[in-house]
């Protein structure tokens, strides 16, 4: 119950027997002291909600679509990871040369070990790709990328002369092949 006050244009509100000064624009939206659900119900038992309120949750499909796109993008990042390493491996292969020393051998070992390790843990990678709709294509791209990395390591081993590709590598009594051309530089004196 409200009554007008003598000064300030405010209103007095009696709530539970105590009078408090209220501003003119204040509106009391609750019924009584308590704010429980039963007090907010009307006399018919209906809940008094504002106009346009609905008890049913509104599904937000834009969030689900954005999540699905994010999962697809993440799965493609995982699948394309080995292919993204190939240009850097080619550059390192070029810079290390074909001589047999500690740096090129370590580089070849790491280049061969990474794809083998990735292929051995492929089941864990496929668990990441299960939520994707293009799971098989992404798995195939992942497999091809790792096989290309292994092929680069094998090629580097062959160019360094570490692979046994001639029969003299296996048998001691066979002479190694002679090189047909020998190139050299410098001035002849």
Curated annotation (Swiss-Prot):
At the top level, the lineage of the source is Eukaryota
- Per its database record, what is this protein's job? Part of the endoplasmic reticulum membrane protein complex (EMC) that enables the energy-independent insertion into endoplasmic reticulum membranes of newly synthesized membrane proteins. Preferentially accommodates proteins with transmembrane domains that are weakly hydrophobic or contain destabilizing features such as charged and aromatic residues. Involved in the cotranslational insertion of multi-pass membrane proteins in which stop-transfer membrane-anchor sequences become ER membrane spanning helices.
Q: Which residues does the entry place in the Lumenal compartment?
A: 94-104, 155-189
Topological domain (Cytoplasmic) residues are 1-72, 127-133
> How is it placed in the membrane, per its record?
Multi-pass membrane protein
Residue ranges of region Disordered?
1-20, 30-63
Name of this protein: ER membrane protein complex subunit 4
Query: Where's it mainly located?
Result: endoplasmic reticulum
According to the record's subunit comment, the protein's assembly and interactions are: Component of the ER membrane protein complex (EMC).
Offer one example of a GO biological process linked to this entry: protein insertion into ER membrane by stop-transfer membrane-anchor sequence
Q: Which family does it belong to?
A: Belongs to the EMC4 family.
Any one GO CC term of this protein is: endoplasmic reticulum membrane
Biased region (Basic and acidic residues) positions are: 36-46
Residues crossing the lipid bilayer are: 73-93, 105-126, 134-154
Subcellular location as annotated: Endoplasmic reticulum membrane
Segments of skewed composition (Gly residues): 1-11
Signal sequence range: none
Q: Does the keyword Membrane apply?
A: yes
Q: Which PANTHER family match?
A: ER MEMBRANE PROTEIN COMPLEX SUBUNIT 4
